[in-house]
Design a protein with these regions (language model features):
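Extracytoplasmic
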Residues: 366-548
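Transmembrane alpha-helix segments characteristic
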Residues: 21-26, 169, 174, 212-222, ...
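Membrane-interface alpha helices of multi-pass inner-membrane proteins
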Residues: 27-29, 121-122, 134, 166-182
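Signature aromatic-anchored transmembrane alpha helix within multi-pass, membrane-resident enzymes
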Residues: 20-21, 172, 218-220, 284-287, ...
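Membrane-interface transmembrane helices that cradle and orient dolichyl/undecaprenyl
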Residues: 10, 111-113, 151-169, 177, ...
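Hydrophobic, aromatic-rich transmembrane alpha-helices
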Residues: 3, 100-106, 195-202, 267-290, ...
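Transmembrane-helix motifs of polytopic, lipid-linked glycan transferases
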Residues: 25, 92-112, 150
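Hydrophobic/aromatic-rich transmembrane helices and adjacent perimembrane loops
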Residues: 134-135, 142-144, 186, 270-273, ...
């Protein structure tokens, strides 16, 4: 009987190990697909703008008006000084953290949940659209999500076991996550309040437990203070200017919750919430304290984030990323709920349902709509601001056409057969239509920096042509005019800001630099009222000759 039982458990574990392997493979693929060709956009430029004009000390002691993550910017500064600053290197820590979460989180919970729950959970983590997105962007949210989860679990294990290794794990994760982004501190420090409350109910042991909490609090406060006090003292005004400026509504919470769960329809959203509630109830029956601990931390920390009214939190995308540390726990309980629902079915049937249900959830989500090749702007809010076009301001407030005829002509060529340099370029995503154009022409795109030939307005993310900056998806007009096109076939010069009814504060003097471009590259091979296109290669000239 014992041998038969062991064989049954081994067979069950083997099946769920296969599901887990599928989840890891899917997660790695989704996070790495076209990873090296993605264009930096929006907040990803904050670090570059800072390191261009600051040294290590200046970076470490300021938060900045346009907030940047201090540790990541220090990392970027190191890369730039050693000739290695590129898009994929900037994003590499987030990529590794996003992949690590799929494996590390189930490993940390291996003694608390059955294999079916952990394998299902890894699948949900792997295909989570917002986690995939943040694993591919040069912002700290993928790292902080991993670190907050580790910190919360480590604190609970330390509280239960009194093992110093868990305490040190908590201190390290809390220090790094808090330094990466202040918004994580409510999640990181709330365990003290919960455990202090439980300690007060322990009778004569309460003072010993409270003393332990106090000691750990001092230990974690020291490195946090060393890292955060200098920028807090220097930039208190900037922080104050960004707090109490946003607002939260029921609608924004609802849309942010749908974003977090990766759906845009009410039915899958309701099903996922119901499964999470069922899973929390099932877990409560076997380990009530852990559920109470997690629910308290998530609820209070999320409430604290919303009550702080940080800037732009009224946008569902902003609120969703600030609350992302809650998501692994929500998906954990949802996975437990799935295990409960399927518990009476045969093992192979349960595993098959989990895999096919995950595939269906992925298909119903946003990613199939933007994983086409090549798409170098997957992080554009056009795809990420809201997964329902009816609520995405990049659909509802900005034009979605018309697409210039030049791009329709390129669409007749094989995908990925030519390379365009699009100039000028705005780091503000709502002033860039390239995601609309690439969806039509399906060719490779590089960003064109037009300084100094066309002026250098700071708002447009212009940076000088230096050895330190080796962004692969950027081309400098000055280099192109020297004949260094680096594989580009067409230079597309946009004459006017886009969209016309949302003009930027400044726009480079394109008309003023066109004579210089024509003198070096020859006459434009295509022009209309909004653009002039120049051939940079023999291949481009051969393509254009067929149009005539």
């Amino acid at each position: 009987m014992i041998a038969a039982s062991r064989n049954k458990i081994a067979a069950s574990n083997a099946v769920w190990w296969i599901v887990f392997a599928v989840a890891v493979a899917a997660g790695v693929f989704l996070r790495c697909w076209q990873f090296g060709s993605q264009v930096l956009i929006d907040d990803e430029w904050h670090a570059i703008q800072k390191l261009l004009y600051a040294d290590y000390a200046g970076i470490a002691t300021h938060f900045g008006v346009a907030d940047y993550s201090i540790p990541l910017t220090l990392y970027d500064r190191f890369l730039s000084l050693h000739g290695g600053l590129s898009e994929w290197r900037m994003r590499l820590p987030m990529l590794l953290s996003g992949i690590a979460l799929i494996a590390v989180a189930p490993w940390l919970m291996r003694r608390r949940a059955p294999a079916a729950t952990l394998a299902t959970w890894s699948m949900l983590l792997a295909i989570s659209p917002i986690m995939v997105y943040h694993s591919r962007t040069a912002r700290p949210y993928a790292i902080t999500t991993l670190l907050v989860f580790i910190a919360v679990v480590a604190f609970f294990e330390w509280w239960r076991q009194r093992d110093k290794r868990w305490a040190m794990t908590y201190v390290f994760a809390t220090f790094l996550a808090g330094w990466l982004h202040l918004i994580t501190l409510p999640y990181l420090l709330m365990p003290f309040a919960f455990c202090a409350g439980t300690a007060l109910l322990r009778g004569h042991e309460r003072w010993r437990d409270l003393a332990r909490l106090l000691l750990l609090g001092v230990i974690v406060a020291l490195p946090l203070a060393a890292a955060l006090l200098p920028p807090l003292l220097n930039d208190m005004g900037a922080l104050a200017a960004k707090s109490e400026t946003g607002y939260v509504t029921v609608h924004s919470v609802y849309r942010a919750s749908m974003l977090a769960l990766g759906v845009h329809q009410a039915l899958p959203f309701t099903v996922l919430l119901a499964l999470s509630g069922l899973g929390a109830w099932s877990w409560w029956r076997r380990e009530a304290q852990f559920v109470a601990y997690v629910v308290t931390i998530v609820a209070v920390a999320a409430g604290a984030v919303m009550l702080a009214h940080p800037a732009w939190v009224q946008n569902p995308g902003t609120l969703a990323r600030y609350l992302q540390p809650s998501l692994p726990f929500l998906l954990l309980f949802a996975a437990e709920g799935v295990a409960v629902v399927l518990s009476r079915l045969a093992l192979a049937v349960r595993a098959a349902i989990v895999v096919f249900a995950a595939a269906a959830l992925f298909h119903a989500g946003p990613m199939p709509g933007y994983l086409y090749w090549p798409n170098q702007l997957m992080g554009h809010p056009y795809f990420q601001a809201d997964y329902d076009p009816a609520f995405n301001p990049y659909y509802t407030l900005l034009p979605t056409g018309p697409v210039p005829s030049f791009y329709h002509r390129l669409a007749q060529l094989p995908a990925g057969s030519v390379m365009l340099v699009e100039a000028p370029w705005s780091i503000v995503s709502y002033q860039d239509p390239e995601q609309l154009y690439q969806a039509v022409h399906r060719q490779f795109v590089k960003i064109g920096m037009v300084a100094p030939e066309c002026g250098m307005p700071p708002a447009y993310g212009q940076y000088p042509e230096t050895r330190e900056m080796r962004l692969r998806e950027v081309r400098h007009l000055s280099a192109i005019l020297r004949g260094e096109s680096k594989g580009a076939d067409f230079l597309v010069m946009h004459l006017h800001a886009w969209p016309a009814y949302v003009p930027p504060p400044e726009w480079p003097d394109v008309s003023g630099c066109l004579p210089t471009i024509e003198a070096k590259l020859g006459p434009a091979v295509f022009r209309d009222a909004d653009m002039e296109v120049f051939a940079l290669s023999a291949k481009a000239r051969a393509i254009v000759s067929t149009w005539h």
